[in-house]
């Protein structure tokens, strides 16, 4: 984590009097979440001087999509007025771009591997076209694109090039231009299930995933933050599951940071304990704990029947 950029981010948040918490696990540079911002929806922030890894982006995507919010990667590699779309609900911005997001300013330009595009509000486009009496063919001809392209614009399946955006504004006005981050989040369908690493008898986490999925629960596996799993039941209740690791002090730090993450993402924290010493201490601290050989109690808790209360 870059000290210079993190200080910029904190200054921006404190200037706007936002409530936030720092996530300080794991304690090395490669982690997926640095800050959780408490706004209308929790926003995850990763601050990086370098390019973020696929694993970091994967964690950010899973948490953001499961909470229907945004993950922001703040880096000097991005231009001020352009957002890079890294994955579903994961957006990279410059420190200047981050300030605009926090100030509520609209950012409408974004970059993908296919080029630079402008975010449009598809529902406003369709409403204005129908209100003004234009057919899809009329608009396609005016823009110089296919009828299918107009269908895609109106369904929200495609955004537009700068050239097409200028013509749309001439025809319908600039209120059809959207915000890359928040308009994308609002229209995003929640994705819960995914392919998990194949069952491995040597890995406790792998066995746990297998048992949870076997009981009809939706699982997302995390690698570079304090929680190990996001679990959702059929009623869409969300749990963060954290597993004790080999080092006592690191485990205590992990649990503390996972508690912060759970609080800000409005999730319930469940801790899996692997030693008797840790079990007693965690129960004294008020954590909801389960022993590794008693996974059925954890499953009962999540499914709402006979869960053991700590």
Curated annotation (Swiss-Prot):
Residues 125-180 form the HTH cro/C1-type domain. SMART domains: HTH_XRE. PROSITE patterns: HTH_CROC1. Residues 136-155 bind DNA. Pfam families: HTH_3. GO terms for molecular function: DNA binding; DNA-binding transcription factor activity. Keywords: DNA-binding, Transcription, Transcription regulation. The keyword Membrane does not apply. This is Putative HTH-type transcriptional regulatory protein M1425_1284. Gene3D superfamilies: lambda repressor-like DNA-binding domains. It comes from the Archaea.
């Amino acid at each position: 984590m870059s000290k210079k950029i993190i200080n910029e981010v904190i200054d921006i948040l404190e200037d706007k009097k936002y409530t936030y918490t720092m996530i300080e696990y794991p304690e090395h540079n490669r982690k997926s979440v640095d800050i959780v911002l408490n706004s209308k929806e929790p926003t995850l922030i990763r601050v990086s001087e370098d390019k973020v890894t696929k694993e970091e982006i994967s964690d950010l995507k899973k948490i953001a999509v499961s909470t229907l919010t945004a993950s922001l990667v703040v880096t000097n590699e991005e231009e001020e007025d352009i957002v890079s779309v890294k994955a579903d609900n994961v957006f990279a911005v410059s420190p200047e771009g981050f300030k605009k997001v926090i100030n509520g300013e609209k950012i409408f330009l974004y970059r993908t591997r296919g080029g630079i595009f402008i975010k449009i509000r598809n529902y406003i486009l369709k409403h204005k076209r129908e209100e003004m009496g234009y057919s899809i063919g009329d608009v396609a001809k005016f823009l110089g694109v296919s009828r299918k392209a107009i269908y895609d614009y109106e369904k929200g399946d495609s955004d537009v090039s700068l050239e097409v955006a200028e013509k749309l504004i001439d025809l319908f006005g600039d209120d059809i231009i959207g915000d890359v981050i928040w308009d994308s989040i609002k229209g995003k369908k929640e994705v819960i299930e995914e392919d998990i690493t194949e069952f491995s008898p040597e890995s406790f986490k792998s066995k746990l995933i297998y048992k949870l999925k076997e009981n009809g629960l939706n699982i997302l596996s995390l690698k570079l933050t304090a929680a190990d799993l996001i679990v959702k039941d059929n009623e869409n209740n969300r749990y963060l599951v954290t597993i004790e690791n080999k080092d006592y002090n690191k485990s205590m730090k992990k649990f503390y940071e996972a508690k912060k993450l759970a609080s800000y993402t409005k999730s319930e924290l469940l801790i899996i304990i692997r030693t008797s010493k840790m079990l007693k201490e965690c129960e004294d601290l008020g954590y909801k704990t389960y022993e590794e050989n008693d996974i059925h109690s954890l499953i009962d808790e999540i499914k709402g029947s006979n869960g053991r209360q700590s």
